[in-house]
From Swiss-Prot:
Transmembrane residue ranges: 724-744
Pathway in which this enzyme or protein is active: Glycan metabolism; bacterial cellulose biosynthesis
PANTHER family the UniProt entry points to: CYCLIC DI-GMP-BINDING PROTEIN
Annotated protein name in UniProt: Cyclic di-GMP-binding protein
Gene label: bcsB
Organism: Pseudomonas fluorescens (strain SBW25)
Subunit relationships: Tightly associated with the cellulose synthase catalytic subunit.
Membrane-topology annotation of the record: Single-pass membrane protein
NCBIfam families: PRK11114.1-1, PRK11114.2-4
Length: 755
C-alpha cells in the first residue's frame, strides 16, 4: 500500500447549519477460476461481514507494475468454526492491460482461492466479483492477499509502466459463515468469550443488574466496562443494560448484590460466602456465557469486579471466592499504559511489534506507529519532540532520489536521503558494514511538532527507492530492496510540561481528559441522575468503556454519586449525566451552563467557532478562543442532546463535563458520537457541542481556566507573553535596575579615583 503522508482537510458547516441542526501464478489461477461467482452476498444469522476498511485498510489498495500485491489480516473467534466464506471484491483496472496475460489473484494464507480475468470490456470501470473461499483455507489467524499481474505488450515492456495498475476498493466485503463452538465454563478463558481480540467488530456486551444498582454496584460495573473498553480498543464497545432480565442470546455480565440465595430468570445464585465469580452457560442460549459477579454488599461486589479486571490471568475454575485483593501501589498521573510515557524516552519497539518495522520493495507502504500522547502537553515555544530514528536499508549501486520520508498524521515532516553505494561517505568502513548483510545502519534525529499531533497520533516512516531504468528490453525488477526501523529508536517528550487551557471537549472526546489523567480514575466522580433507568446506565457504562479505551486500564477507583452527595466529591473532576428534570445540578448550576433544556424550552449559546477549521489547534490558547456572542432560545418537542465543559463550581482547577439530553435515549446519541465512526463527519470540540443523530455541531470554544503546572521560569514567560502591559512594566523596571547599578558602579569608581 502507498500511504498518503499528507492530511486532507475536512469541510466545516456554517453557523446557519448549526442553528438548523438544533431545530430539528497463472496455472494455479486458471484452476481456481471456478471459485468466482456473480451472485450477491446473502445475509445469514450464523455469519458476519467485514469490509477491508474494518480490517485495517485505511484507503484503496493501489497495485502497480507487472506484479504487486497487498493484504489484510482477518482472524476467527475462538468460539467459532468457519463453514464458508466469500469475498465481494470491488475493483477497477487499466484499459491498457492484455486480457490473456493479466489477472488479479485472491489468496488466503498463500493459497490461491480464485483468479479473476481482466477482460477489455470491463476495463476502466468499477467491477464487482463474488469469490468463494474454501473453508479449509481459513485458520485461526489468516492473511487475505490480492495479487495483481499485469502486462501491456507482448514485446519488451517497462515493469513499472504507468498503464500497469489495478485498484481494490476498501469497501470490498469479506463475508464469513460460522458455527459456534461451546467453550468450557472455566474462568481461565477470560476475557473470552466476552472479548476476543481476533474479532474486528465493535463489542456489544450486555450488563444485567439483578436488582436496582446503588453507587457501589455502578462503580463495580464501571470497572468491568472500562476493562472491556480497553480490550476493545479501536473497535469501540457498547454495553446495553437490563434490570433482572437475561439476554435471549449471547453473552452477558451479571452483577448480583445479595446476602441470600436468589433466582434470576432461571439462574440460581447461591448464597455468597464472599466476593464470588462464576462462569456458566446462558440458560437462554447454550452457546452463550454468563459471568456472574456476586457480593454480599457493595464493597464485596467491587472487590469481585476488581478481581476480574486485575487478576483474570490467574483465575481458574467454574467459580472462585476472592478472599483478598490488595492494591500494592497507587496510580501516578500520566502512567496510563496506552499513553506515551512523559518521564522517560520511549522505544518504538514498545509501541509496535518488531516484525511490523520492516518492509521490502521499491515503493513499500509506510511503517506506521500508533502513539497516544498525553493531551495536556504544553507546546508553547517548544521546537518539537525529539525522534531519534535508527534504521537500516539496502543501498543501491546507483541512485539519485532514494529517500526516507518521515510523517506525522499524514503530514510530511522530513526527508532523508538514502545514498547509493557510489555516493556513500565513510569509505571502506561503510563498505565493510555492507559485507555483513547487505544493509546499512544509519541514524537521524528530527523534531516532531506537537502542534501537528493529536492525542491519538500516527508516526509514519516510508522507504522510497529510486528505480533506475537500464533501457529497452533491459529493465527488470529485482525484489531485493529492504528497509527497517530499529526498535531501539526513541521518542522523548520528557522536555514537555503538563498545562492546558480548559474546558476542552476535544481532549475529552479523544482521551477522556481530564478524568483519565489518573488511569484508575481515582480523582474522578460520576454524578448520575436521581431516577436513572437502563438508558442512563448504558450511557454511563459506555462512557467508562471509552475511558478504558483511552488509558488501557480499568477504572477501579471511580466514584459514583448523585446530586445530593456531590459535595463529598468536590475535590474531583466530575462527569455529570443529565436527562430532563432527573438531574438537580442542571438548575443548581444553571449560571455556569452554556445550554439548558427544560421540557419544550431550549436555550443555547453560539459563537463563530463553526466558521473555523478545528482540525488545526494553535499552540497559543488565545488563538483557540471562540467565546459565545449569540444566544438562541426556542420551543420544540424534538430530542436535544449536548455536551458542555466548564470549571467546577465546587473547586477551582477542577473540571465538569456534562452530557445532557431532554430524553433518556438521547444520551445514547452522545455516547455513539464519542465512539465515532465513518458516519460522523465532525468531532466533538470546544466547550459546547450539540449532537443530532450523526451530526455533531461544536458551537462554543470558551477556554476560561488552566489545569496542570508550569515551572516558575516557563510560567513567567507565559504570563508576560499574554500581558503586554506587564511585559513593558517588567522591562522598564529591569532597565531601571540595570541603569541604577551602572550608575552606582561608576559613581563608586569616580570616588576611588578622586581619593
Amino acid at each position: 500500500m502507498t500511504s498518503n503522508i499528507f492530511a486532507r482537510p475536512h469541510p466545516r458547516r456554517a453557523l446557519a447549519l448549526m442553528i438548523a441542526s438544533l431545530m430539528g501464478f497463472n496455472t494455479l489461477a486458471q484452476a481456481a477460476e471456478q471459485a468466482v461467482a456473480t451472485v450477491p452476498v446473502q445475509s445469514t444469522d450464523t455469519g458476519y461481514s467485514l469490509t477491508l476498511k474494518q480490517l485495517g485498510r485505511r484507503d484503496t489498495m493501489n497495485l502497480q507494475g507487472v506484479e504487486s500485491s497487498d493484504s489484510v489480516n482477518f482472524d476467527i473467534r475462538a468460539d467459532e468454526v468457519v463453514k464458508g466464506a466469500q469475498l465481494l471484491l470491488k475493483y477497477s483496472y487499466s484499459p491498457a492491460l492484455l486480457a490473456d496475460l493479466s489477472q488479479i489473484n485472491v489468496l488466503v494464507n498463500g493459497e490461491v482461492a480464485a483468479s479473476l480475468p481482466l477482460p477489455k470490456e470491463g476495463a476502466g470501470t468499477p467491477q464487482e466479483q463474488l469469490v468463494q473461499i474454501p473453508a479449509h483455507l481459513i485458520t485461526e489467524f489468516n492473511r487475505l492477499s490480492l495479487q495483481f499481474i499485469g502486462h501491456y505488450t507482448m514485446s519488451c515492456e517497462d515493469p513499472l509502466h504507468s498503464s500497469l495498475w489495478a485498484k481494490i476498493s476498501n469497501s470490498s466485503e469479506l463475508k464469513v459463515q460460522v458455527e459456534p463452538i461451546v467453550l468450557k465454563d472455566d474462568l481461565a478463558v477470560l476475557p473470552l468469550p466476552f472479548f476476543d481480540k481476533r474479532d474486528a467488530r465493535q463489542v456489544s456486551l450486555p450488563f444485567v443488574f439483578a436488582t436496582a444498582p446503588d453507587s457501589a454496584a455502578l462503580e463495580a460495573a464501571g470497572a468491568l466496562s472500562s476493562w472491556i473498553g480497553g480490550l476493545a480498543s479501536y473497535r469501540g464497545a457498547t454495553f446495553p443494560t437490563t434490570l433482572g432480565e437475561l439476554p435471549a442470546k449471547g453473552n452477558a455480565i451479571v452483577l448480583v448484590q445479595t446476602a441470600d440465595a436468589m433466582d434470576i430468570h432461571g439462574v440460581a445464585v447461591a448464597k455468597p460466602a464472599g466476593p464470588t465469580l462464576t462462569l456458566i452457560a446462558n440458560p437462554n442460549d447454550a452457546n452463550g456465557k454468563l459471568l456472574i459477579v456476586t457480593g454480599r454488599d457493595g464493597a464485596e461486589l467491587k472487590r469481585a469486579a476488581n478481581a476480574v479486571v486485575l487478576g483474570n490471568p490467574v483465575l481458574a475454575g467454574n467459580s472462585v471466592v476472592i478472599t483478598k485483593l490488595d492494591t500494592l501501589a497507587p496510580r501516578r498521573p500520566y502512567d496510563a499504559p496506552n499513553w506515551l510515557p512523559s518521564n522517560r524516552p520511549v522505544r518504538l519497539g514498545e509501541l509496535i511489534e518488531q516484525q511490523k518495522l520492516s518492509v521490502s520493495g521499491y515503493n513499500p507502504g509506510a511503517i506506521s506507529v500508533d502513539m497516544r500522547l498525553p493531551p495536556d502537553l504544553f507546546n508553547w515555544r517548544e521546537e518539537g519532540v525529539p525522534l531519534k530514528l535508527k534504521y537500516r536499508y539496502t543501498p543501491q549501486q546507483v541512485s539519485t532520489n532514494s529517500s526516507l520520508l518521515i510523517g506525522l498524521n499524514d503530514q510530511f515532516m522530513k526527508s532523508v536521503a538514502l545514498p547509493s553505494v557510489s555516493n556513500l561517505g565513510g569509505g571502506q568502513t561503510l563498505l565493510d558494514q555492507l559485507k555483513k548483510d547487505e544493509s546499512l545502519p544509519r541514524e537521524v534525529t528530527t523534531l516532531l511538532p506537537i502542534s501537528s499531533a493529536s492525542p491519538k497520533s500516527k508516526l509514519q516512516v516510508r522507504f522510497m527507492y529510486d528505480y533506475i531504468k537500464e533501457g529497452e528490453c533491459r529493465d527488470i525488477i529485482v525484489d531485493n530492496m529492504r528497509g527497517s526501523v530499529d526498535p531501539d529508536s526513541t521518542l522523548d517528550v520528557t522536555g514537555y510540561q503538563h498545562y492546558i487551557a480548559m474546558p476542552n471537549l476535544g481532549v475529552f472526546n479523544d482521551s477522556g481528559f481530564p478524568f483519565t489523567r489518573l488511569a484508575d480514575l481515582s480523582e474522578s466522580a460520576v454524578v448520575m441522575p436521581d431516577n436513572y433507568g437502563t438508558d442512563e446506565l448504558t450511557a454511563y457504562l459506555t462512557v467508562l468503556g471509552r475511558f478504558g479505551e483511552a488509558t488501557g486500564y480499568p477504572a477501579t477507583a471511580v466514584k459514583v454519586v448523585q446530586a445530593k452527595d456531590v459535595q463529598s466529591v468536590a475535590d474531583k473532576d466530575l462527569l455529570v449525566l443529565a436527562t430532563a428534570a432527573n438531574q438537580p445540578l442542571l438548575k443548581q448550576w444553571q449560571q455556569y451552563l452554556p445550554a439548558t433544556s427544560d421540557g419544550e424550552q431550549h436555550q443555547f449559546l453560539l459563537s463563530d467557532l463553526p466558521r473555523y477549521v478545528r482540525s488545526w489547534i494553535s499552540p497559543d490558547p488565545a488563538a483557540n478562543q471562540h467565546p459565545a456572542n449569540t444566544g438562541i432560545t426556542f420551543k420544540g418537542l424534538s430530542n436535544s442532546t449536548w455536551l458542555a465543559g466548564f470549571q467546577s463550581p465546587l473547586k477551582s482547577g477542577r473540571s465538569v463535563v456534562l452530557i445532557a439530553s431532554n430524553q433518556p435515549q438521547g444520551l445514547l446519541e452522545a455516547t455513539n458520537a464519542l465512539i465515532g465512526g465513518d458516519d460522523y463527519k465532525d468531532s466533538i470540540q470546544g466547550s459546547l457541542a450539540v449532537v443530532q443523530g450523526t451530526q455533531i455541531s461544536s458551537l462554543v470554544g470558551d477556554e476560561q481556566y488552566y489545569v496542570g503546572k508550569l515551572n516558575y521560569f516557563k510560567f513567567m514567560q507565559w504570563q508576560l507573553s499574554q500581558n503586554l502591559g506587564w511585559m513593558l512594566l517588567i522591562t522598564f523596571l529591569g532597565l531601571a535596575v540595570v541603569t541604577s547599578l551602572i550608575y552606582l558602579s561608576l559613581r563608586a569608581r569616580a570616588k576611588r579615583r578622586l581619593a
